[in-house]
Design a protein with these regions (language model features):
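Hydrophobic-ligand binding "helix-grip"
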Residues: 2-12, 72, 76, 80, ...
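Hydrophobic ligand-binding cavity/cleft-lining segments
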Residues: 2-78, 164, 169, 173-194
């Protein structure tokens, strides 16, 4: 039997208001960093342990996180992230796991000196026969402040946009083993050229 949740099964994280980026959202994240907030949730038809296990191996994340170029896992708590930014640039930071409970949640924060100060939490809640509700909350400081955030949004590289897309790709990958795309793969292009 699953423990009762204060949230409906498919609801997003409790604190999703951009107006309260420093309030309840930050209160749920140890060592919270960032003034902008985004929160997303998706139900994935897989058991909690499978989803948690895949996500906890941070080297797996570039497989479904479109803007993540690479993640170098340094140890059980520390990893180095390289992420695409607008205008062909990249941003980098070291992230440290600040708190976790196996099969329940992982919280992290960027280390001092990060080009994008950020922190976040991903939660995995049993949804019975429907699988697992995966909720993601991210706090971040966009490079360039509000202007940088607008540019990132225009370039489709803003974390709120990416979080939604990345969770949907995570769902596709875990449920079907692949991520749907409108792009042709090499074999399809060669077949069409023949």
């Amino acid at each position: 039997m699953t423990e009762p949740s204060p949230h409906p099964a498919d609801s997003g994280p409790a604190a999703t208001s951009k107006r309260d980026a420093g309030g309840e959202t930050a209160a749920t994240l140890p060592e919270a960093k960032g003034r902008s907030a985004t929160a997303q949730a998706v139900t994935i038809n897989k058991p909690v342990s499978e989803l948690y296990g895949y996500f906890r191996n941070f080297a797996n994340l570039p497989a479904f996180m479109e803007n993540v170029v690479s993640i170098d896992v340094k140890d059980d708590k520390l990893s180095h992230w390289v992420v695409k930014a607008p205008a062909g640039a990249t941003v980098e930071w070291d992230a440290r796991v600040t708190e976790e409970q196996v099969d329940r949640f992982i919280s992290w924060t960027s280390e001092p000196g990060a080009s994008v100060a950020n922190s976040g939490r991903i939660e995995f809640r049993d949804a019975g026969r429907r699988g697992t509700v995966v909720s993601l909350t991210i706090l971040y400081d966009p490079p360039g402040g509000i202007i940088g955030k607008i540019i990132a949004k225009f370039a489709q590289r803003e974390p709120a946009i990416q979080a939604r897309r990345d969770l949907n790709r995570f769902k596709q990958l875990m449920e079907t083993g692949e991520i749907a795309t409108s792009a042709m793969n090499r074999a399809q292009r060669e077949e069409e050229m023949a």
